[in-house]
Amino acid sequence: MASTGSQASDIDEIFGFFNDGEPPTKKPRKLLPSLKTKKPRELVLVIGTGISAAVAPQVPALKSWKGLIQALLDAAIDFDLLEDEESKKFQKCLHEDKNLVHVAHDLIQKLSPRTSNVRSTFFKDCLYEVFDDLESKMEDSGKQLLQSVLHLMENGALVLTTNFDNLLELYAADQGKQLESLDLTDEKKVLEWAQEKRKLSVLHIHGVYTNPSGIVLHPAGYQNVLRNTEVMREIQKLYENKSFLFLGCGWTVDDTTFQALFLEAVKHKSDLEHFMLVRRGDVDEFKKLRENMLDKGIKVISYGDDYADLPEYFKRLTCEISTRGTSAGMVREGQLNGSSAAHSEIRGCST
């Protein structure tokens, strides 16, 4: 019979415990071959609220539409911009989950006097209050996500977002790199972005808080783009010819702005190959989402069971994709300000 010490040793080995007494690390999810073999220039990254919420979880306005409207309402109340009855009405609409786009539109109208001068609107003040000092509110795990996004951009990927914040641009600036924020009010720049002439620009399809006049909540707000056939054709060609990778997006494809830009005129969507990274969570909900998205040409992929699994999964994916992009000669020296090492390496992996 084996000694007690030997038995303990065998048990430790069976359960994967080592000298430090730590349990084995969780086995990482495998990367989907059809995604990991993409090159950066073949991708359009779509950044949703889930990414912003992961980067700065202490900012409620980043977590959802409802959270943003509540934060704007709180700011308006703090600045004494609403009558008691008005604030009660808005609070009631939020509590009852009324159409949030309409609620947001009504609130913005209330904060914006009848003038074309954005500087004279209180809406701008409320926005700046809501998104104040975002740099100091970023968490390290969230920065890892932004680092991966930035690395793919440097290697040729395009980026668009449904978010109003500029967290990615702020992170890039902290790394000594300059990204441009675009919105749909500038048709010329949007066209150049779609033609891949502004790869180091982030397209905010709802606008960005630093330019309140460019914020749109409904397709009616950017008819100039929708009526510009050249711009729309270039935008839709992206959805037909590239692979969109949805990050932290959930149901972004149901967003009226996204649909108007990318989905409505695109035929045979089920023949396309796009990807959506989501937390597995509830199994039935996951299966339902996967089935619904396949009709739109989107493969739903689980990065893990917990939100905390995303940064590491996306980092591994970025390393794999960037390696292929670099070997194909995608990295161009001097593309961004900063050292050449930044172009070829991401922390924890070599490309």
Swiss-Prot record:
Signal peptide: none annotated. The keyword Acetylation applies. It is found in: Nucleus, Cajal body. InterPro entries: FAM118. GO terms for cellular component: Cajal body. Pfam families: SIR2_2 (PF13289). The keyword Membrane does not apply. Keywords: Acetylation, Nucleus, Phosphoprotein. Belongs to the FAM118 family. May play a role in Cajal bodies formation. This is Protein FAM118B. It comes from Homo sapiens (Human). The gene is FAM118B.
